[in-house]
Amino acid sequence: MQQTNPSVQTLLSIGGGGANATTFAAMASQASTRASFINSSIQLARSYNFYGLDLDWEYPSTATEFTNLGLLLDEWRAAVVSEATSSGNTTLLLVAAFYYSSDYYGLTYPIQDISNSLDWVNVMAYDFIAPGWSPNVTGPPAALYNPTSQVSGDSGITAWIQAGVSASKLVLGLPFYGYAWTLVSADDNGIFAPANGAAISSDGSIAYSQILDFISQNSATTVYNSTFVTNYCYSGTTWIGYDDTNSTSTKVTYAKGTGLLGYFAWQIGQDPNFVLSEAGSYEFNHFFFL
């Protein structure tokens, strides 16, 4: 990618939703294993000319693990600074993907360590509702606002800022996918309609490209809800919550207006012809205050 687009700065990402959180916890629990992880990550990043490192530990689950996360970040920062000094290279960027809120089920992220050690935080403001944990009712998987609960992109960003992380270090996550439910009744097809589990796939997840195919092939009805800042579509008893160009653009405007560093998406391979990518990019580059 860098050979084709030299201006693109790639990061080496470690972890993800499918990674073993217990393995991360074990690594972070001791100074020796943290050092081994840190040193090997720096060596690997340099070997392949990455510009930085991205940690995606989903998720620490105890107060001790959150404390150890803070130690890991501090030691990682010290190590990349030391390596850059000795090698003469530019200091590697350090980034992490975190929960949508600074509060994780009553546990708090190590705010000071995050502020001191990371260049930015990718805030995963999605997967709020899905058939896997809400099989009986539809909902907006990545609502920017939610008048019915505190679970939303805006509430999460607000929590991070109020906890002490600068808005300029926060990056808003956008999903290029959605979730599909099976409606109990085709006639009851709005947000929070009664449902009977997942549709289309085993967990209901569906890429944006597949959503467009579903809409086209089934002449599905599409709706944009500005209260939640979400899209949904339905045909028969299949209901899909997702983000389209209008919700994506609104979220990018929000990110810019709130003073965030920017936005990221999971993931561009699900965006055919860069429809959502271009909508976000246009909004970010043409934003102005009224």
Which ranges hold each PLM region?
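Short, acidic/polar
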Residues: 28-49, 102-113, 153-158, 242-256
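Hydrophobic, secondary-structure "cap" segments at the distal end of domains
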Residues: 201-259
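Receiver (REC) domain switch/active-site residues of two-component response regulators
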Residues: 51, 119, 261
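Acidic/aromatic/glycine-rich contiguous surface patches that form carbohydrate-binding/processing clefts
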Residues: 179-181, 243-290
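Glycan-recognition patch characteristic of GH18 chitinases/ENGases
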Residues: 1-45, 278
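Conserved, mostly hydrophobic/aromatic
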Residues: 12, 55, 76, 121, ...
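Substrate-binding surface in catalytic domains of secreted glycosidases
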Residues: 59-211
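Mobile, glycine-rich extracellular loop/lid and propeptide segments
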Residues: 15, 52-60
